[in-house]
C-alpha cells in the first residue's frame, strides 16, 4: 500500500520558488509590439489649395514608425488621376525630436514605392483591403524608420522631446479630374511601437532594456533630376551620398508628370571607377522580379516608370547583397539615353534613397538587412 513503511524525509507539497540565474533575456523576448492612436482626426474637404497638418507622436517605448490610415467620403464624379490614391498626399515627412528630418518631404507616391520596395516584408500597400482609387480615395501608408526586427527603431521614452509627422493634403484637382464634389478626407494616425520591457521576467531573469537595432539610424531622402529630350543622353548623378545605401528607386516622368518607361538600353550604373551594371531596362526589371517575391509570383505588378536597385539582404529567402557604402565624395551615376520615342519632354527623374547610419555596434543578424 502507498505510504506503508515510509522512513524517508517528508515531502513538501508547496511549489518551490523560481530561481533566477537563467541569464539575460534578449529584448525581443521581453518586449511586445503594440499600436496606439494619437492626435486628432481632422476631416478636411479638398479645395483648390493644399493644406498642411502637423502632429506630435505620442511618447512611449521604441518607435517603429507611424501608420497613416486615410479615408474619404462625399466625393462625386470625376476620374482618379494616375497616382491616386497615394497622391492624396502632396508631401509627407517624419521629423526627429530635434526638428531634423528622418524621412524627408516627398509625395505620397514616393513613400508608397518606398514602403513597397524598401520594406517588402510588409507587402504591397496597394494590394491591401482598404486601398481604393477614385473620387473617395482610401488606404494606408506606413512611414517606417525601422527596417525590421528593431533595426532602426527610435527611442521614444521622453515626453519632453517628441517626434513629429507632417503631411500636406493635395488639391482636389491634383487627385480627381472633373469631379463635381470634392471628397472630405480623414486621416487616423497610429504609432507602431516596441514596448519598454520590464526589468526582469517572471522568474527574476533580467531583460535587456534596449533593442539591439537602436544602434542603427535610418534616413529617407530624394533628389529630382532633369530627363532630357528624346534620344538625348542623361547622366543622372546621386547627390545623396555619405551613408550606407539600402536601396535606390528611380521614378521617371514626362513633362505632364505622368510616369513613363523612358530609359533606354544601355543603363550604365557606376560608383566612382567601379561598374555596378551595364543593363537593359528589361534586365533591371528582371532583377526586380528576382528579388521581390510579390513581383515574381504575380501578386503585384511593376509600376510604369519605376526602376528599383535594392542593396540589402533578405535573410528568409537568402537573396540580396550588402549595403552599398558611400562617402561625401562618392560619384554614383546612371547613364542612359531617353528613348527616341519619348513625348512631352524634358521630364524628371526622382531618385529615392533609403540610407542607414550605424551609430554603435550592430549584431551580425541585423547587418545588411
Model-based region annotation:
Residues 1-369:
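Beta-strand-centric surfaces of beta-sandwich/beta-rich domains
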Amino acid at each position: 500500500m502507498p505510504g506503508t513503511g515510509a522512513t524517508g524525509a517528508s515531502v513538501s507539497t508547496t511549489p518551490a520558488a523560481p530561481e533566477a540565474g537563467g541569464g539575460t533575456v534578449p529584448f525581443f523576448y521581453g518586449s511586445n509590439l503594440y499600436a496606439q492612436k494619437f492626435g486628432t482626426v481632422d476631416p478636411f474637404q479638398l479645395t483648390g489649395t493644399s493644406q498642411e497638418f502637423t502632429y506630435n507622436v505620442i511618447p512611449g517605448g521604441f518607435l517603429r514608425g507611424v501608420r497613416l490610415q486615410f479615408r474619404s467620403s462625399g466625393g462625386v464624379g470625376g476620374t482618379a488621376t494616375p497616382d491616386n490614391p497615394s497622391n492624396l498626399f502632396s508631401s509627407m515627412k517624419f521629423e526627429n525630436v530635434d526638428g531634423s528630418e528622418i524621412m524627408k518631404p516627398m509625395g505620397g507616391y514616393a513613400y508608397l514605392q518606398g514602403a513597397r520596395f524598401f520594406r517588402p516584408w510588409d507587402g504591397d500597400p496597394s494590394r491591401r483591403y482598404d486601398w481604393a482609387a477614385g473620387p473617395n480615395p482610401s488606404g494606408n501608408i506606413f512611414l517606417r524608420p525601422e527596417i525590421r526586427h528593431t533595426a532602426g527603431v527610435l527611442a521614444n521614452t521622453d515626453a519632453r522631446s517628441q517626434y513629429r509627422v507632417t503631411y500636406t493634403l493635395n488639391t482636389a484637382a491634383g487627385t480627381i479630374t472633373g469631379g463635381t464634389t470634392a471628397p472630405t478626407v480623414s486621416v487616423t494616425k497610429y504609432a507602431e511601437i516596441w514596448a519598454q520591457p520590464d526589468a526582469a521576467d517572471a522568474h527574476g531573469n533580467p531583460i535587456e532594456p534596449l533593442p539591439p537595432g537602436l544602434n542603427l539610424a535610418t534616413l529617407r531622402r530624394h533628389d529630382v533630376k532633369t530627363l532630357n529630350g528624346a534620344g538625348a543622353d542623361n547622366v543622372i548623378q546621386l547627390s545623396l551620398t555619405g551613408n550606407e545605401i539600402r536601396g535606390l528607386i528611380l521614378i521617371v516622368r514626362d513633362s505632364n508628370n505622368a510616369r513613363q518607361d523612358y530609359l533606354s538600353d544601355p543603363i550604365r550604373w557606376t560608383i566612382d571607377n567601379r561598374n555596378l551594371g551595364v543593363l537593359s531596362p528589361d534586365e533591371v526589371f528582371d532583377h526586380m522580379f528576382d528579388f521581390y517575391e510579390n513581383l515574381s509570383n504575380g501578386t503585384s505588378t511593376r509600376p510604369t516608370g519605376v526602376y528599383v536597385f535594392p542593396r540589402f539582404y533578405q535573410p528568409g529567402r537568402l537573396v540580396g547583397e550588402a549595403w552599398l557604402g558611400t562617402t561625401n565624395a562618392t560619384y554614383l551615376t546612371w547613364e542612359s539615353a531617353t528613348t527616341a520615342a519619348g513625348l512631352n519632354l524634358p521630364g524628371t527623374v526622382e531618385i529615392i534613397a533609403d540610407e542607414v547610419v550605424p551609430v554603435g555596434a550592430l549584431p551580425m543578424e541585423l547587418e545588411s538587412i
